[in-house]
Regions:
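Short, well-structured N-terminal submotif of metal-dependent ribonuclease cores
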Residues: 1-16
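Short, glycine/charged-enriched secondary-structure capping and boundary segments
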Residues: 1-3, 28-30, 108-111
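A generic local structural motif
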Residues: 1-2, 42, 80-82
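Hydrophobic/aromatic ligand-binding patch that stacks against planar heteroaromatic rings
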Residues: 4, 86, 104
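PIN-domain endoribonuclease scaffold, especially VapC-family toxins
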Residues: 9-10, 18-67
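Acidic, PIN/NYN-like endoribonuclease modules and their adjacent C-terminal/linker elements
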Residues: 15-17, 89-93, 99-130
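Short, surface-exposed amphipathic charged segments that create phosphate/polyanion-binding patches used
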Residues: 29, 70-75, 125-130
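Active-site neighborhoods of divalent-metal-dependent phosphate/nucleic-acid chemistry enzymes
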Residues: 54-99
């Protein structure tokens, strides 16, 4: 995953909800523990991984898009509302391996997903952007 984020800027543009930065910050202690890294090392790793991601505030998305996204994920995983709303608003794919989410939304006609394996294959088979 790190390779895709760090080495794909010539091929892809990554966007994410701004709250994702806050989520990473909240989990610094756990990240230090499971990685065995000091806080400064975790912060540096975060910088390297996140520097190619454009973080966008949710205020840019229309209320109607939020409502549509909420309805789609209500019985699957309401915590994924942000990702569906961003995908619909920016007309982009959701990078995910969450099979429950992907299958649940596919049953409702929403199939705008790409997996890590698909991203690697796509990058391998495409030319860099100018």
């Amino acid at each position: 995953i790190g390779d895709l984020l760090i080495n794909s800027q010539k091929y892809l543009e990554f966007i994410a909800p701004y709250f994702l930065r806050e989520e990473i910050f909240k989990h610094y202690p756990r990240l230090c523990k499971i990685s065995g890294m000091a806080l400064e090392q975790v912060r540096e790793s975060e910088f390297q991984v996140c520097k190619e991601i454009t973080f966008i505030s949710e205020e840019q998305i229309k209320q109607s898009t939020w409502l549509t996204a909420e309805k789609l994920v209500a019985d699957i995983d309401p915590k994924d509302t942000h990702y569906v709303a961003y995908s619909k608003h920016f007309r982009c794919k959701i990078w995910s391996g969450d099979k429950v989410l992907m299958n649940g939304l596919a049953r409702k006609g929403f199939t705008n997903f790409i997996t890590t394996d698909e991203l690697f294959k796509w990058r391998q088979n495409n030319e860099p952007r100018p």
